[in-house]
Amino acid sequence: MRRRPLCVVLVCMILGILCNAWINTKEPVSYERESIHFLCELEEFVKKDNGYTLVVRDVKGENSFSCKKIKLYANENTAMPKELHIGNLLAVTASIHSFEKPGNPGQFDEYKYNTELGITAQGFAGKIEIKKNTVKNPEDFLHRLRNQLQDVVSLCCDEKTAGIVSAMVLGDKSGLSDEVKQLYQENGIAHVLAISGLHISLIGASLFFVLRKYFMPMQGAAVVTMVLLFLYGILTGFSISTQRAVIMMGCMLLARLAGRHYDGLSALSFSAICQLLIHPMVLFQTGFLLSYGTVLGIYVFVDVFCDAWESKNPIWMAVAGTAGIELVTLPILLTAYYEFSILSIAANVLFLPFMGGILVTSLAGIGLGSITLFAGKFCFGFAHFCFMLFEWIGNLFVKIPGAVVITGKPTDWQVLLYYGSGVLFLFLQKWKQKKIFLLTLAFGVFVLFLPVHNNFDLQISNLDVGQGDCSCIRTKNHTILIDGGSSDVNKVGKYRMVPFLKSQGISYVSYLFLTHSDKDHTNGAVEWLCAANQMGVKIGTVILPKLNEKEEAYCTLLDELRNKGCNLMFMQRGDTVTIDELRISCLHPYPDYEWKSANDSSLVLKVNYQNFTGLFTGDLEEAGEKEIIKKLSHVNYLKVAHHGSKGASSEAFLEQVKPDVSVISCGKKNRYGHPHKETLKRLENIGSKVYRTDKEGAVSFEYQNGKWYLSLWKKESGKKRLLSDW
């Protein structure tokens, strides 16, 4: 440390940022405006299939409205000019909204992500006009050049190859399919899909070598290399990893010019200090942590492992470097993605040697493809072959039982103990006692993988899926889902249901009950079942209501499930499923039930556990309630039917069940007006405590050691509190 003062400065800086973040826990500022007119400067824009995404800054609007940056979305209904240029002064009419905090455990935190980038709000533009046609020429030129190069890639490659090349070389991930992202993530090689230090090092070193050898002296070659790398960074969007790599390459070239020794850890620290001075909150971004953790793992652990085993063999050094990366970044990956690839070291050792060739031939393909498509296609042939090979090997790896381990999100104390063990490991390795320091490392990994998400006897969670339904029941050994869909959240299975399950360490769902065939109860489940490898979370049995008279939507759902080879089971009145101490009884429907509304054919499930009784009612309405009302008595918990519609939860029904607590699953400001005032009034009249997913986020009840606990994810950040009246 004495020889590396920059490392000390960085540590002090990080501690200061952490203390500041802990002390300043302000409530987010509300930017809600239904319609507002404002002036702003265009910072960047990206064309999407359904319109544009723009980032604008220096926003000043009517009624003293102002903020630093806003992310704007423009679609086919937005009135806007045909051409936009970075630097344009825009006059915008839009609705402005604050970023939502996550409503469920495991859900992506768009509020945290955007605020760390300095973007304070989002808006949906109705009209965009150019007020002043100012243009930032270098940035705008590079932006347009990037679009032209993307067109070249698209013309020379098939869609899948073009998406990967654009991500790796041009920094544009919009063309990557979900299947490719998932495959690379499950194999632990998702980092190759981003422009990283590997790319910058290869490009920078090659440029410097060629310029110095054939064109100019060392000083000139270093300056030109730095300028070109900086422009390449702007061209590709200057991501966090690109910024780090460019700064570190600059430090290396400056050391070369000054005739000084290049110290990687000092350069890494200097790069981090530069980024944190500009955006301190970027410290909490997964991309920042992974980028710096990767390089730190290489610098620290390659020498440690090579010295311990007294080997400088290139293959062993590659394994040591990859192992070092995994050791440093493991808690970051588990905190962000909740899963870990056992074969990631092998995948990296196999795939990384190809990256130099892929990068060189891809750059050549882009350059030559701009002149003649034939030459471009020829150059991209190597990349296409490599990606096919990666896909084939990657699919083999993920099919190996236990290749991907879903651990759940580790707690803070687990992460601290893990890194504490890592620091102790580094001290012990100086003694050359392999067994001792390996045991220390093994202890850290063991602590990190400890299951901490099922320290309860029973858990019932109602997820925030917008205008839809999804409930999760967990025992010590099993997980059951009741419904899974939404009418206003896109890809609800991918972005809310599966992340929740993975964050809790769940890799297998024993039973999935689909109460009826409405999309807002099923589309997330179908999306999940139809995804590659079921997004890593398997489903045992799908249970549907047993009906003689089936509507078209029910038949369509049945066909989809059968086509995916799902294990199906049908329930009717009187059927039961017993799981551990949990008993799930079907109260409705019976096969000959003649329903007028498909909602009234919903599965109605009574859940019994010791002295607890819960009732799940799907979208059951008053006509269906009359079929079961005589079979009902007091329940502790009611999942309110049909999102709180006034046509459900009749007075007679509620008087019969008199639930202690009632949970309503509905979307924020939904177009149906759910929950209706009449329903809320009826629940109030019987003295039932009401919780709503649109206001409180995920609502969870846990039974542990004879006591019930409640946690509200959005309203109370998931903190448990004792329910004294249960």
Model-derived regions: residue spans:
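Di-metal (Zn2+ and/or Mg2+/Mn2+) metal-binding site signature of metallo-dependent hydrolases
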Residues: 189-214, 508-532, 641-652
